[in-house]
């Protein structure tokens, strides 16, 4: 009578995940007993690798909002359903006791904007709320389930808007934005109420949803955001052995010491973090740049004070399939446009235009940001940290960065850049984080 659902971003985020192309996490999901999965960073591997992993996955991999391009289908690229064009199975029906529950999959809609399309050139993504409504109506008419649940990687705000515009969904169980939401959030729409849930990330919580289904309807439910205190849970011997076996061929490299730290190295804030600052500082130092830009990723584990930084630790912040670095001259006006564009992806008033992630991390500059302002007006007072000079719109600056989504950059992978920096530093202390001046967000618990 129980289903175990995985909200995505599971096959990526460590050295072994990168080196095995996600296979290590597929094996872990199988051991955990996952029933249904959706994706986002799963699609940062090549399409053939994604499909190979799905074949090895015991769980069903669902996505109602990924389609095979028409010209790709004409060239022989396979689809789950050639009539609809769905690349993957869009939904499934599960029988739990006497109840029949429909689960619809929703992948991250902006995957090919936020991540390289070159890895998955034959698939299109989108929110596809009209397709969602058509699918919900079809399931109701043809399958007549007792409950309809969407397993989503939209992000919390986008899920709330989808709950407003799509009717007939009972619950949306969401991922992507890493929000640990303590209660099921009710959203009214024209046919009733849809509850939106989000369970944080990285195994910190589980969403536990108990449904009381009687006579073909949900009579009542109980929602629990269950914290996971890993140190209090006895380790599973089978899982422990699996992890040890996965890591064994790489153990010497993973445990290789690089430097030490007297500060907590973390990636947690919407605008910055000490790990991100190290990456930004490394880009400036190793690349000889004035300014650095690093993506606003949310994944990665922390390193505690007085701990040795190992290569494994570094890879939890950088292990990805497009890690290449760059250094090039960029005009001040373009730097502002980059900051404005990322800010609009995050703070656009329309949740369907929010592409998720956190604000791009910066090194060598500080700035003021008003998230509630209009695009083009959010970023002001950009200043060079070293000299205190204001950024000149007409002047070119040497900018270093990594993780380009379009064309592949030609530089070394970012972990090599950061390792060089850390080895030179030997010991990390008194990190000065380039924190923007954030205005207009007092009392907003979602911005830190």
Descriptions of predicted regions:
Residues 1-230, 270-282, 292, 346, ...:
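Acidic, metal/ion-coordinating pockets
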Residues 117-121, 261-269, 316-325:
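Glycine- and acidic
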Residues 100, 264-265, 390:
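Short, solvent-exposed loop/turn motifs
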Residues 222-235, 384-388, 404:
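Short, solvent-exposed aromatic-acidic interface loops
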Residues 24, 45, 89, 127-130, ...:
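Generic recognition of stable, solvent-exposed alpha-helical segments in well-folded globular domains
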Residues 58-61, 65, 69-72, 77-91, ...:
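Feature captures C-terminal
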Residues 43-48, 124, 155, 232-237, ...:
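General structural signal for secondary-structure boundaries
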Residues 227-310:
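Hard-cation-handling environments
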């Amino acid at each position: 009578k129980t289903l175990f659902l995985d909200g995505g971003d599971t096959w990526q985020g460590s050295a072994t995940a990168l080196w095995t192309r996600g296979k290590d996490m597929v094996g872990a999901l199988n051991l955990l007993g996952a029933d249904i999965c959706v994706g986002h960073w799963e699609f940062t591997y090549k399409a053939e690798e994604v499909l190979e992993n799905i074949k090895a996955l015991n769980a069903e991999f669902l996505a109602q909002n990924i389609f095979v391009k028409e010209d790709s289908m004409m060239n022989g690229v396979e689809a789950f359903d050639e009539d609809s064009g769905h690349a993957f199975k869009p939904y499934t029906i599960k029988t739990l006791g006497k109840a029949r529950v429909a689960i619809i999959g929703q992948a991250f809609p902006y995957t090919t904007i936020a991540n390289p399309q070159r890895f998955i050139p034959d698939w299109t993504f989108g929110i596809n709320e009209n397709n969602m409504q058509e699918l919900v109506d079809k399931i109701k008419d043809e399958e007549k389930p007792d409950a309809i649940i969407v397993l989503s990687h939209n992000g919390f705000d986008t899920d709330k808007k989808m709950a407003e515009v799509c009717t007939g969904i009972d619950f949306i169980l969401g991922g992507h934005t890493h929000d640990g939401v303590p209660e099921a959030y009710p959203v009214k729409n024209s046919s009733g109420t849809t509850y939106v849930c989000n369970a944080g990330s990285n195994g910190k919580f589980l969403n536990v949803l108990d449904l009381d289904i009687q006579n073909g309807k949900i009579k009542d439910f109980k929602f629990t955001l269950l914290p996971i205190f890993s140190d209090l849970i006895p380790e599973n011997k089978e899982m422990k052995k699996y992890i040890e076996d996965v890591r064994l061929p790489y153990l010497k490299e993973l445990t290789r010491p690089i430097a030490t730290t007297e500060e907590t190295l973390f990636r947690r804030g919407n605008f910055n973090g000490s790990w991100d600052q190290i990456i930004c500082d490394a880009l400036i130092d190793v690349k000889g740049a004035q300014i650095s830009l690093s993506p606003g990723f949310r994944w990665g584990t922390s390193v505690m004070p007085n701990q040795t930084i190992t290569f494994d630790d570094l890879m939890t912040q950088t292990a990805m399939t497009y890690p290449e670095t760059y250094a090039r001259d960029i005009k001040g006006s373009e730097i502002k446009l980059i900051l404005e564009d990322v800010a609009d992806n995050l703070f656009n008033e329309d949740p369907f235009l929010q592409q998720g992630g956190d604000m791009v991390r910066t090194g060598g500059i500080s700035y003021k940001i008003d998230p509630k302002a209009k695009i083009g007006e959010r970023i002001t007072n950009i200043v060079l940290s070293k000299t205190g000079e204001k950024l000149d719109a007409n002047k070119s600056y040497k900018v270093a960065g990594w993780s380009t989504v379009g064309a592949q950059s030609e530089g070394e992978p970012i972990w090599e850049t950061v390792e060089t920096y850390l080895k030179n530093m030997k010991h990390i202390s008194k990190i000065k984080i380039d924190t923007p001046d954030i205005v207009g967000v007092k009392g907003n618990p979602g911005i830190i």
